[in-house]
Amino acid sequence: MFIMSKTLLEFNNLVTEFHTEGTTVKAVNDISFTLNKGETVGIVGESGSGKSVTSLSAMRLIPSPPGKISGGEIIFHKKNGEKVDLLKASEEEMRSYRGNDIAMIFQEPMTSLNPVFTCGDQVLEAIMLHQKIDKNQAIKLTIDLFKKVQLPDPERIYST
């Protein structure tokens, strides 16, 4: 009998550091927590406390240099029950997870959407980057996503 894990993501003793001007700063130092399926977790802390670095570590988007994930593990529990240590996954594997299985919602809206481009085009670009579908299917999926999050008049929002 297959028992599906309720665990989705595990951070175990994660250490992420930055090397600058002859010194090392541990932005994340030995943090551990578990995210379960269907759970919403808010990472709260003062400016510079490592919130974004923790999330960027999970997606392996720490700029290197100067940053480096130097310890711990981040275990992703896939839908099929397989466990993957994201810190040991290949870059190709990570690209397949980003946007499909793991995503980050930034707190500053200006870092999320570019006002020069339409909302629809920006979401469409992310979908086409991560899914093997044609542009018409991606447009439909984008509008469906806007409907799913209950945006009013999704077709209009797609083009604004």
Please place each PLM-identified region on the residue numbering.
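ABC transporter nucleotide-binding domains
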Residues: 2-160
